[in-house]
Regions:
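Short coil/turn linking the two alpha-helices of tandem helical-hairpin repeats
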Residues: 67-77, 108-120, 152-158, 179, ...
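Terminal, low-structured helical/coil segments at or just beyond the last alpha-helical repeat
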Residues: 181-235
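Structural register within alpha-helical repeat arrays
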Residues: 28, 61, 66-68, 107, ...
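Flexible helix-coil transition and linker loops at the boundaries of alpha-helical arrays
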Residues: 47-60, 90-103, 131-140, 172-184
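The tetratricopeptide repeat
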Residues: 57-58, 62-64, 103, 110, ...
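N-terminal leader/linker segments that initiate helical-solenoid repeat arrays
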Residues: 17-74
Length: 235
């Protein structure tokens, strides 16, 4: 369960579209997230001609590349390495073109992926760039949630689950007045909040969020098949 939870939590901020709008074309990929169908994301990434893509299209590709890298960390390290290298090159190409805080957030994610692959041990760079992103965009729900994610999973002595929970709660409030309220960023962030409540001994709050998510998204297979059953059985 731990590996799946880590994968899903990593993936939860994958749709960092910045200012690119969620469209009907994204709905199948949202369903792919809910149903853990990462090949659909890979197909989308490789079907996009980066050189010919518009800025919005490139932002969209970065969003799915991020999630795809996170997924491959648990299933195919060789593919994860290639995907991370491609993601890094694309992020560098977009320096100065992304909304405030997003370049730094992506760099933080790249350091996290490289750490997971054993290619980099700059743990503090993960936190440094995440903090910079939050400083630049303190009211962006995706960036706020990402910082919560970093603190949730950072090693002991660096991470802080209570601070992470406060950030997840802030992100949840910000999502309510955000263009992303109806995108998958919101349910994904709420899953993180549920997991954080669980890890801080607040099982009832975790159950409440998870049940609400399943009512809203019946095809959220991780919650339906893994998280809720395990949470019900937890002491």
């Amino acid at each position: 369960m731990r590996k799946i939870a880590v994968f899903l939590l990593c993936c939860m901020f994958m749709c960092m579209y910045a200012n690119a709008q969620f469209t009907a074309a994204d709905q199948p990929l949202m369903n792919a997230y809910l149903e853990n169908d990462m090949p659909a994301w890979r197909a989308f990434i490789h079907a996009t001609d980066w050189e010919q893509a518009t800025q919005d299209e490139r932002q969209r590709v970065l969003a799915y590349e991020y999630g795809y890298c996170a997924a491959m960390m648990e299933t195919d390290k060789a593919e994860a390495q290639k995907a991370t290298q491609l993601f890094h090159s694309h992020v560098q190409a977009m320096e100065g073109l992304l909304p405030k805080g997003y370049y730094e957030m992506y760099l933080s994610a790249i350091y996290a992926f490289e750490f997971k692959l054993g290619q980099s041990f700059h743990v503090f760079s993960i936190l440094r760039y995440a903090n910079k992103a939050l400083e630049l965009a303190p009211n962006d729900p995706i960036i706020v949630g990402y910082m919560g994610n970093v603190l949730f999973y950072a090693p002991k002595g660096i991470g802080d689950k209570k601070k992470a929970l406060a950030l997840f709660e802030k992100a949840a409030t910000l999502f309510e007045t955000s263009q992303w309220k109806y995108c998958w960023n919101r349910p994904a962030m709420l899953l993180a909040a549920a997991q954080c409540y669980e890890k801080t001994g607040r099982k009832n709050e975790a159950l409440s969020i998870a049940n609400d998510l399943l009512n809203e998204f019946p095809n959220f297979t991780y919650i339906r098949d893994i998280y809720l059953p395990a949470l019900h059985n937890a002491k």
